[in-house]
């Protein structure tokens, strides 16, 4: 096992073999309502929920490093790239993709893993080709500095209308694994059986994303379906930090992932 494998292992529970990561990297790609609170205050609440990891951008990791600087803290996971997800911004600027930081810089910031997008179906084929090249290059560099790379493999390109198509999700997840991902973050198909199809075709662990905020019962049910379908964990964001009680919501989702009720 190399350093990347060792650090990847720290994200996964020893007993359940699964991981629950809270995503808090939305400020670069989506319009976050100011009324949800100050970023560092929200990050503190997220850490208090005791997820296995927290996904943040470079700036917030710098500003909130003290929240991860203790034994037993969640693993800081670094968003290393940028794309346009907000539909109104897409209308103004089109589809765009850029790399934000390098694995070496991520290691210097204290990240325990990196996350990068891999988006199938953009209007311009060159964007997908450049995206594949950037992810493959980062995967190589990340292992040189002992960091694992989680690839967020999705169908968010404008040429694809069905964003949860099981066959296409299986295809993009397989591509992610083949070009060097240590794990994949992707959509839950909405059905455990079709999710199992996606998981079976991917050579690395699959974790599912949460998407737009929904009702608590629906979110928990979706999480259960993903785990039943073979997902090795969840990377949920808005459904945690936009919840009325982020700590309680984290506890509910951790129970789904790890199968152990969280006391308190």
Where do the model's predicted regions map?
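Cofactor-binding loop segments of dinucleotide-utilizing enzymes, especially the Rossmann-like FAD-
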Residues: 211
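A short, acidic, flexible beta-alpha connecting loop/helix-capping segment that sits on the rim
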Residues: 238-244
């Amino acid at each position: 096992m190399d350093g990347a494998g060792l650090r990847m292992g720290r994200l996964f529970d020893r007993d359940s073999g699964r991981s629950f990561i809270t995503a808090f990297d939305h400020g670069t790609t989506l319009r976050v309502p100011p009324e949800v609170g100050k970023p560092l205050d929200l990050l503190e609440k997220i850490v208090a929920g005791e997820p296995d990891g927290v996904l943040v951008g470079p700036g917030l990791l710098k500003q909130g490093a003290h929240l991860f600087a203790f034994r037993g803290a969640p693993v800081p996971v670094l968003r290393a790239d940028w794309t346009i997800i907000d539909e109104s911004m897409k209308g103004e600027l089109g589809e765009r993709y850029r790399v934000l930081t390098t694995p070496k810089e991520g290691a210097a910031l204290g990240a325990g893993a990196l996350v990068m997008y891999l988006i199938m179906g953009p209007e311009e084929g060159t964007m997908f080709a450049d995206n594949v090249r950037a992810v493959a290059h980062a995967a190589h560099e990340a292992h040189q500095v002992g960091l694992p790379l989680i690839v967020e493999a999705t169908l968010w390109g404008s040429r694809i209308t069905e964003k949860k198509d099981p066959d296409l999700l299986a295809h993009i997840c397989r591509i992610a694994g083949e070009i060097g991902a240590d794990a994949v973050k992707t959509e839950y198909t909405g059905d455990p059986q079709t999710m199992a199809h996606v998981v079976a075709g991917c050579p690395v662990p699959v974790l599912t994303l949460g998407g737009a905020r929904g009702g608590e019962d629906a979110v928990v049910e979706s999480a259960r379906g993903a785990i039943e379908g073979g997902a090795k964990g969840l990377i949920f964001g808005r459904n945690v930090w936009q919840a009325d009680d982020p700590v309680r919501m984290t506890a509910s989702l951790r129970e789904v992932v790890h199968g152990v009720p969280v006391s308190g």
